[in-house]
């Protein structure tokens, strides 16, 4: 009994030390364990150095069961905890075990009651992800909090009779960029972090509203990352999502894009300014150029890193998007329409409608708009000059590329993947 009392006193002190560390430095950005089998000094096991919080490993076997059991007793109504105690206990527990759903649910209740600032939970989740970057419960709770934060922003703007609409829109975009950074850090800490990349897609769909500028910016910003992580399926899948979303924008096929909720959609939400949304969506982009550049990047990576199946799987998906683009435009073309010719995968000529031709004849303006009177951003305008759509997107060019790989490569894995890709190409074309 005496030993249990000593442990309880120790654990209570550790919880207070963790709470005190956050009060002394609210900018803590990383948490980690310090290997220490035994307590060698009579001091706190919580170490704070600049913005890094360390926990000596010897205390975990006492600390984690204590806060876990304490929270369960509270949920079973066998123990009363006041507001501050609940916040401290759940914070400590989630930093050590962020997949404990009950703790997140308790914090949801605190947020709903107005006791806990939801921004604090975003900070806690971000910190937990530095130690547990794949924690599914942390990502799930983060999405719930983000929805609530944006809802509060929207309601505040509506109550204010649109007085703060521009500020609200900018704040939402700031949240989007912050989430992109959180996802980037988590993806770098854990290979093929599906949860991180899935959250990134969710943010673009539900907070970014699938606007064109964000899609293109993300395509550009992740190029270097995937070049450094050539075996990361999730990272390449994210780029496939971006290109597919741009394809759906081009074809105006809303059925192929996940529906955006009314939370921030302009048509249903008067809070977001129509002109600001137009600036984000009326950006000229050259989809054939983007697809061709993706194929070039893929080929460079295949040459530099032979034998990686991820790269071949990605090439399949990009060529499939090219095939879909050519097929859709071929079906929608009319004899009266102004057209541009592109060689499709079968060697035939697809005549593109005048609507699509406007995309392939204009430079891709990332930060600006076609109308100089509607410049919504003061950033330096970035333009990518498009090259004519070449035969590099055709089936024949792909077959020549595969033959070159099979002839020159020395990697048996590369040869096997190339042969499998050729078989897939021929089946796609109906051979």
From Swiss-Prot:
Disulfide bonds: none annotated. InterPro entries: Prenyl_trans_a (IPR002088). Keywords: Prenyltransferase, Repeat, Transferase. It comes from the Eukaryota. Residues 363-383 are annotated as: Disordered. GO terms for cellular component: cytoplasm. One of its GO terms (molecular function) is protein prenyltransferase activity. PROSITE patterns: PFTA. Belongs to the protein prenyltransferase subunit alpha family. This is Protein prenyltransferase alpha subunit repeat-containing protein 1-B. It comes from Xenopus laevis. The gene is ptar1-b.
């Amino acid at each position: 009994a005496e030993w249990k009392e000593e442990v309880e006193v120790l654990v209570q002190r550790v919880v207070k030390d963790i709470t005190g560390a956050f009060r002394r430095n609210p900018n803590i950005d990383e948490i980690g364990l310090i290997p220490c089998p035994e307590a060698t000094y009579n001091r706190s096991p919580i170490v704070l150095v600049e913005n890094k919080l360390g926990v000596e490993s010897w205390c975990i076997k006492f600390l984690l069961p204590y806060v876990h059991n304490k929270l369960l007793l509270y949920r079973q109504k066998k123990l009363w905890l006041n507001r501050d105690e609940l916040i401290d206990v759940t914070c400590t527990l989630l930093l050590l075990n962020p997949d404990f759903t009950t703790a997140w649910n308790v914090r949801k209740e605190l947020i709903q009651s107005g006791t806990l600032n939801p921004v604090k939970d975003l900070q806690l989740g971000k910190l937990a992800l530095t130690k547990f970057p794949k924690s599914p419960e942390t990502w799930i709770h983060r999405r719930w909090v983000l929805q609530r934060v944006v809802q509060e922003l929207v309601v505040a703007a509506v109550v204010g009779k649109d007085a703060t609409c521009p500020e609200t829109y900018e704040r939402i975009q700031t949240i989007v960029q912050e989430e992109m950074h959180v996802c980037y850090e988590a993806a770098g800490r854990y290979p093929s972090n599906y949860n991180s990349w899935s959250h990134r897609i969710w943010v673009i769909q539900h907070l970014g509203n699938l606007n064109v500028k964000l899609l293109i910016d993300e395509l550009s910003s992740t190029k270097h990352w995937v070049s450094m992580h050539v075996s990361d399926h999730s990272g390449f899948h994210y780029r496939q999502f971006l290109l597919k979303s741009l394809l759906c924008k081009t074809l105006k096929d809303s059925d192929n894009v996940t529906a955006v909720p009314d939370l921030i959609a302009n048509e249903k939400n008067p809070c977001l300014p129509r002109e600001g949304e137009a600036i984000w969506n009326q950006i000229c982009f050259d989809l054939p150029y983007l697809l061709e550049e993706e194929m070039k990047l893929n080929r460079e990576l295949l040459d530099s890193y032979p034998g990686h199946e991820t790269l071949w799987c990605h090439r399949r998906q990009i060529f499939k998007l090219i095939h879909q683009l050519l097929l859709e435009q071929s079906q929608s073309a009319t004899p009266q329409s102004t057209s541009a010719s592109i060689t499709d995968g079968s060697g035939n000529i697809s005549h593109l409608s005048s609507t699509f031709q406007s995309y392939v004849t204009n430079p891709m303006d990332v930060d600006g708009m076609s109308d100089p009177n509607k410049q919504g951003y003061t950033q330096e305008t970035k333009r990518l000059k498009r090259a004519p759509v070449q035969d590099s997107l055709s089936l024949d060019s792909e077959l020549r590329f595969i033959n070159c790989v099979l002839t020159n490569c020395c990697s048996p894995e590369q040869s096997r993947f190339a042969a499998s890709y050729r078989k897939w190409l021929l089946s796609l074309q109906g051979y």
